[in-house]
Amino acid sequence: MNKKVLSILIISIILSGCCPNESIKPNNTDTSPIIVSDPIKEKTFPFTGKPMTSNNTSLPFMAIIENSKDARPQSGLSKADIVFETMVEGGIPRFIALFHTEMPKEIGPIRSARPYFLEISQSLDLPFAHCGGSEDALKSIDLNNLMSLNEMKFADAYWRDNSKKPPHNLYTSSEKITSLLNEKQINKIPTSNLKFDSSYWDNKDFKKCSHIKISMNKSYDTSYKYEDGIYKKLIGEDTFIDKSSNVELSLSNIVIQQTSITLSKDNIHVEIPLIGEGKGYVLSQGKIIPILWSKKDLTSATELKDENGNIVSLSEGKTWWNIVDKSNEISLN
């Protein structure tokens, strides 16, 4: 072979070995920061933790409801988000119920206001339906310009059931109260310090309790029985029934707030201090924990904390809130 040709061939082989045939790929790596958006938080009703539709326009309000023997069975309580129960004069229990998640067609019997019911409504910043009140309550309504929906001023928002004797026959409805709120331009945006997290009650250290009885006085006791994932309320041995819907109450949470209930200076009415702190219990999902409650002032909300100082979470759903004297007997099963 020609030496010149051979030299060229050798040089070509050497050069091809030094330059491997690698394809050059463009660098498509995107070095711009990745933005991760927070998940959209589901809107919920503030007093039950239930999901709220985007087009919900219901206005929250409260109603003072009688609980004497002549008033039972009451209407509308099965649809209340929260019912606060305590005593009035004569050892007779009375309720102030909060409505927002569900709006009943009939609510009552409506009765008169007391200062401690006003304080509950102030702490939640909500209007309340009632018919008259004690002298101290009516003075407080005027002095503090409270959102009173007094039947004595707004009779068109109420009616009498002639099948029952007065004063146990005064009723209202969500529709009538909502109309009155719109007329008075009371469009409160509800807020709540309550925390809802059902998983809180998965704690295996919480004590099980399927039945609790509160003896509020010699003539009245109430109890709560946990069955099939809900609490049913009993007065004495009778299951509590909603007259308007003919259903038993289905409750997710029971709160027991212990305070000192004393007789007023007039020796007729009672005083129930709700500002300060004290002990109590919360029941949910068939379990019970001791709690410490506190309230800073007239308009602040009541906080519920466990014995370690952590905020107590409620299960999603309705709550019955008992305000009792700390000497009342409480029996657990």
Predicted feature residues:
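A surface/extracellular/periplasmic glyco- and lipid-processing/surface-interacting theme
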Residues: 24-82, 89-333
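C-terminal motif of bacterial Sec signal peptides marking the signal peptidase cleavage site
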Residues: 14-17
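Bacterial signal peptide processing site
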Residues: 19-22
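Positively charged n-region of N-terminal signal peptides that target proteins for export
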Residues: 1-4
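Hydrophobic alpha-helical targeting segments used for export or membrane insertion
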Residues: 9-11
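Sequence-pattern detector for short linear motifs
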Residues: 6-7, 28
